[in-house]
Design a protein with these regions (language model features):
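ATP-binding/phosphotransfer module of carbohydrate and carboxylate kinases, centering on a glycine-rich
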Residues: 1-82, 92-97, 114-122, 139-147, ...
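Short beta-strand segments
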Residues: 25, 84-88, 127, 152-159, ...
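A short acidic/small-residue loop/turn micro-motif
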Residues: 49-51, 106-107, 178-180
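A charged helix-plus-loop insertion that forms the helical arch/lid used to bind
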Residues: 96-107
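ATP-dependent carbohydrate kinase catalytic cores
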Residues: 117-138, 152-154
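Glycine-rich phosphate-binding loop of actin/hexokinase-like ATP-binding domains
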Residues: 142, 146-207
Length: 357
């Protein structure tokens, strides 16, 4: 790619239906890249496993190759607005430097922005993946459906991320590390976290946490289902525990109940501080909503005065319906972070087509 059209140049024709952006969703498990048009949505996308064994530079090489392929495919028909990248945090901005990311071992201090820009030969836009998921959910998902201007989001995947939109603007904090909801304390002296602390929400409500808690429960109870799972697949994952829960395993269901309790404790602090009308839970683990949400809501009622007063389902509430507290699964599903990365690279005045699939 010899030269890229900048967002400022594209903004001169901001209603141009031929504008497109390329978004990157860099995760600890998967690397996804998409070309996006404001008038047509996702034009094309590609996904691959994140090869952590190749190191940060190796992952960036794969990322850049996928980005260039999509640019070459669509640049003859569309004007490129820019490239947006979402990455696990903590992410220091504006430097684009990653600090001790729990889900990207060996990446501490890696200059992600600089490495990508050197390889592509152009500036990029970069933000934490959870912030971008929140922004997409605000622009294209529940934020648009409910016509609200603020929301808080937790992403439940390999780890637990957080994002915050206030008064229509993505709020990233003083240096990009705002809304690190995965590191809210839920259990004093709890499980050690990759951030260096103990008892963080991420250690009880992420995919890695579900697998760990299932192993701990196996030692406690010797559950037949969990025992058979361990025998057939010693390195079982959260997906395996989820499948077992769907098959009726009481102990597998107990793992998700414990996850819900931890989420309720963490959300209680967030709700008490922010007092927003919408909190969104996204990421792969949301498929287990019915397994963890009842315990989550019960814990919230116990621990959050604000939630008890403003809960959407509270009978005889004096709070107007539009201002009541909703906690809902994300509307955009696993595409939220990728869509957010695409939106990040567009001129902010550019209108976008609502997500419709």
């Amino acid at each position: 790619v010899d030269s890229l059209t900048t967002s400022e140049q594209v903004a001169n024709s901001s209603l141009n239906s031929k504008v497109f952006s390329v978004g990157v969703d860099l995760g600890g498990t998967n690397l996804r890249v998409a070309a996006y048009s404001p008038s047509h949505g996702i034009l094309d996308s590609t996904s691959m496993l994140t090869d952590l064994s190749s190191g940060p530079e190796g992952v960036v090489r794969s990322l850049v190759s996928a980005v260039k392929t999509l640019i070459d495919r669509f640049s003859s028909d569309y004007d490129l607005a820019g490239i947006g990248v979402g990455t696990p945090g903590p992410l220091e901005l504006p430097a684009g430097r990653i600090h001790n990311p729990p889900n990207l071992p060996g990446w501490d201090g890696f200059e992600l922005r600089a490495c990508i820009e050197r390889s592509i030969g152009s500036a990029i836009s970069i933000a934490s993946d959870a912030n971008l998921a929140a922004y997409a959910e605000f622009k294209l998902g529940l934020g648009q459906q409910l016509e609200i201007d603020s929301l808080s989001m937790l992403t439940l995947g390999t780890g637990v991320g957080g994002g915050l939109v206030l008064n229509g603007r993505l709020w990233e904090g003083a240096n990009g590390m705002g809304a690190e909801n995965g590191h809210v304390l839920v259990y004093e002296d709890g499980a050690a976290c990759g951030c260096g602390s103990k008892g963080c929400l991420e250690q009880y409500a992420s995919g890695t946490a579900v697998a760990r808690m299932a192993r701990e429960l196996l030692k406690e109870s010797g559950s037949h289902g969990l025992r058979e799972l361990y025998r057939s697949k010693p390195s079982f994952t959260a997906h395996d525990v989820y499948r077992l829960a769907r098959e009726g395993s009481e102990d597998a269901c107990e793992v998700f109940r414990r996850m819900g309790v931890a989420l309720g404790i963490g959300l209680a602090s967030i709700v008490n501080v922010l007092n927003l009308s919408l909190y969104v839970l996204g990421g792969g683990l949301v498929v287990a909503w019915d397994l963890f949400a009842p315990a989550m809501v019960n814990e919230l009622r116990e621990r959050s005065y604000v939630f008890r007063i403003t809960e959407m389902d509270r009978a005889n509430s004096i709070v107007p319906e539009a201002l009541r507290t909703r906690i809902l699964p994300a509307a955009l599903g696993p595409d939220a972070g990728l869509l957010g990365a695409c939106l990040l690279a567009l001129p902010r005045a550019q209108p976008v087509t609502p997500f419709a699939s």
